Swiss-Prot record:
Taxon lineage: Eukaryota, Metazoa, Chordata, Craniata, Vertebrata
Superkingdom, natural source: Eukaryota
Subcellular location: Endoplasmic reticulum membrane
Biological processes annotated in GO: hormone biosynthetic process; thyroid hormone metabolic process
Name recorded for this polypeptide: Type II iodothyronine deiodinase
Amino acid sequence: MGSASEDLLVTLQILPGFFSNCLFLALYDSVVLVKRVVALLSRSRSAGCGEWRRMLTSEGLRSIWNSFLLDAHKQVKLGCEAPNSKVVKVPDGPRWSSTVVPCGSRIQTGGECRLLDFESSDRPLVVNFGSATUPPFISHLPAFRQLVEDFSDVADFLLVYIDEAHPSDGWVAPQMGACSFSFRKHQNLEERIGAARKLIEHFSLPPQCQLVADCMDNNANVAYGVANERVCIVHQRKIAYLGGKGPFFYSLKDVRQWLELSYGRR
């Protein structure tokens, strides 16, 4: 009975956010449809270009609902011990040979390690979760790169590549500009690592930012309630800053503000 009451409470907490996300997608689809109709009526050459993919689909609804469930049941809490999730180091040539790894870390090239292995006792660790098929995450990568360049002298940075947000065999997102990626749902760790490497080939991050992939059980994704994208700051093994659920509350500006308050403006 207690479990049923708990599930009901979680559902009631999720519903407002779920419906607001659905409303946003419905409005987005409507705007895109109107634009296409106007283009057709004006006989625009671009009217028939590209396939129109609706965002508000049954696959999309399931994905949105599951993302809210993941957020509701996340293990991570602000001010508490950071979950020490298993991750896999992504080999990326000179990136790893030129990266300074915190003393005492138990990190092996291409092998399984723990998220907190990348944290040093006196420096905060900025952890950015996302995937190549997540448009908001991709659009924020230049800002993340600037963060690394500005604060790598006082903080460490880690990019965790997770399950695809919009896989080609699932809830496909419309192409957003020239830097659009297409990956299917990862069938094995090799595919996930391959997707991570292709992302970094396109967005060259500074060598001070280390790159890992979530394990195939998605334990980091679950522990941190990521779903599609999330950012947090770990300091002395505790969560010093916990970003909101993406896409609407995923913000690197707040991370910059935290770092500036702690270490000064760059």
